[in-house]
Amino acid sequence: MHIICKSQCGNRAALKRPKTGDALCKECFFAAFEAEIHHTISSSNLFRRGEKVAVAASGGKDSTVLAHVLKLLNERHNYGLELVLLSIDEGITGYRDDSLETVKQNRDDYQMPLKILSYEELYGWTMDRIVAQIGRSNNCTFCGVFRRQALDRGAKLLGVDSIATGHNADDIAETVLMNVLRGDTARLRRCTSIRTGGGEDTIPRVKPLKYSYEKEIVMYAHYKKLVYFSTECVFAPNAYRGHARAFLKDLEKVRPSVIMDIIYSGEQLRFKDTVKKPERGTCTRCGFVSSQQPCKACVLLEGLNRGLPKLGIGKKSKGERMIAKQNQELALRERANLVKNDF
């Protein structure tokens, strides 16, 4: 027995949407997926007519679908945007060099200008060399910090008004979980924000795919026959995010709505005024956005250049600092009791 598309178009259903459970034909799925992203963009006022927007392009499924859909919606709904691709070459042999070929294919397919910036030219280091120095235990710390700043540098060079990133609903739910588990209230405050930055000296970042499920992004790319790079980073298996992702997938099997539930919970969180929130300013060394002086990128880079690669990555988690404080207080009390007993 054939299942008919729920939208009552009369066509046979080709898939079941992971997000809603609806059985849809391909064309109705495309329409629903694109309409939801358009709603996200318009309801959140992510763009203004005449703006120049850099799409952070990695060649993966998320950035490829983002570039495709933004181009389509820009033309369909007359956003009036100038779209460009911005890609970062971290210098990972067997991964980024191959994925950049996909980015170049995206450039040709969507007829968008492409700017590629490398860690080598920005910092004088590649991730291959960094991993050779530090091993694989903290490589994601270096890469994440450098990549975020590299996007800011590239955006400034291109003179764009905002950076559109391919963060999807799964990514955001994972980040909420990670920040809860780490006790990182500062990041927990902003990790669900659809727009970040945008101060006097910063270029805002927006997440048009914030409410798009990863499974649906893969389905969209598959049925649209989009060209994307699907190999995982060779340094990623040890990443903390991978554990949060595995946990989220297990939860999703039991409760399909858990991704949106976690995002909603993150959006509704409130913190006491006494919780210290780090102020985001400008690094006195490099001039880019930072919540510390000097910025994390400058500290890590200084460590590499001085032959001290562990510099800047030894900070304890909130929980570890709390345990250390409790132990210190306990030791002081025990010492005080010993002194009292001596008398």
Swiss-Prot record:
Q: Which Gene3D superfamilies match?
A: HUPs (3.40.50.620)
Which InterPro entries does this one have? CTU1-like_ATP-bd, CTU1_C, Ncs6/Tuc1/Ctu1, Rossmann-like_a/b/a_fold, TilS/TtcA_N, tRNA_thiolation_TtcA_Ctu1, UPF0021_CS
Q: What happens when the gene is disrupted?
A: RNAi-mediated knockdown is lethal in larval third instar (L3) stage.
Single biological process term from Gene Ontology = protein urmylation
Any coiled-coil regions, as ranges: none
The record's subcellular locations are:
Cytoplasm
- Asked whether the keyword Transport is assigned, the reply is no
For whether the record's keyword set contains tRNA-binding, the answer is yes
The highest taxon in the source lineage is Eukaryota
Question: What is the predominant subcellular site recorded for this chain?
Answer: cytoplasm
From the UniProt record, give the pathway where this protein acts. tRNA modification; 5-methoxycarbonylmethyl-2-thiouridine-tRNA biosynthesis
Output the Gene Ontology terms for molecular function.
nucleotidyltransferase activity; sulfurtransferase activity; tRNA binding
Q: What does this protein do?
A: Plays a central role in 2-thiolation of mcm(5)S(2)U at tRNA wobble positions of tRNA(Lys), tRNA(Glu) and tRNA(Gln). Directly binds tRNAs and probably acts by catalyzing adenylation of tRNAs, an intermediate required for 2-thiolation. It is unclear whether it acts as a sulfurtransferase that transfers sulfur from thiocarboxylated URM1 onto the uridine of tRNAs at wobble position.
Q: Which family does it belong to?
A: Belongs to the TtcA family. CTU1/NCS6/ATPBD3 subfamily.
What is this protein's record name? Answer: Cytoplasmic tRNA 2-thiolation protein 1
Organism placement in taxonomy: Eukaryota, Metazoa, Ecdysozoa, Arthropoda, Hexapoda
Report the gene name.
Ctu1
